[in-house]
A protein has these predicted regions:
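Non-heme di-metal
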Residues: 1-196
Length: 196
């Protein structure tokens, strides 16, 4: 639970950050919030319909739940650090750099979810073979693996750098807890890919 980490010092640190530091911290937080919001619904919607192993179903449900906690954690940071949290939230989807970075993840999820649901309901999708549907599943899995193993960690490094400077340490602590979870998600996605 993110509430277990105090952000009092972060509120004070925020006031002392230079404008470019505030920009980096905020842009990074917006990116993390958007991608974890996507991940908060992605694994269950995309992968669960194709899962037949009870232990893997439980794993995917847990993964999905953990991602929703991460999204709440970013919300907790934003609400406790910024005097006007709505300004941060409102700009998440209007920042073209953030949405462009997230597009490859959302695109592969959307393709799999849309075609997969039609396939499951109708048993067919016009012009889509079983092989192509499997290819879309594979692409989504690989994309999620890259998200969990590379993209999140690039953004985490930024948060950790603030912590190393003894700035925004509460936020860095919360991010370190999220990073711990993401390493588990990375292991899960790699296991699925290796055994697919």
């Amino acid at each position: 639970r993110p509430q277990e980490v105090s952000l009092q010092k972060d509120r004070n640190d925020w006031q002392e950050l230079r404008p470019e530091q505030k920009h980096i911290f905020t842009s990074n937080l917006r990116y993390q919030t958007l991608l974890d919001s996507v991940q908060g619904r992605g694994p269950c919607l995309a992968f669960l319909p194709f899962c037949s192993l009870p232990e893997l179903e439980s794993c995917i449900l847990t993964w999905d739940f953990m991602e929703s906690i991460h999204s709440r954690s970013y919300t907790y940071i934003i609400k406790n650090v910024y005097s006007n949290p709505a300004d941060v939230f409102d700009k998440i989807l209007t920042d073209k750099y953030i949405t462009e970075r997230a597009e490859s993840v959302t695109r592969t999820y959307d393709e799999l979810i849309n075609d997969g649901q039609r396939w499951l309901l109708d048993g067919t999708v016009q012009g889509l073979s079983t092989k192509e549907l499997k290819r879309k599943l594979w692409r989504a899995l690989v994309n999620v693996n890259i998200l969990e193993g590379v993209r999140f960690y690039v953004s985490f490094a930024c948060s950790f750098a603030f912590g190393e400077l003894k700035l925004m340490e509460g936020s860095a602590k919360i991010i370190s807890l999220i990073a711990r979870d993401e390493s588990q998600h990375l292991a899960v996605s790699q296991h699925i890919i290796k055994n697919y």
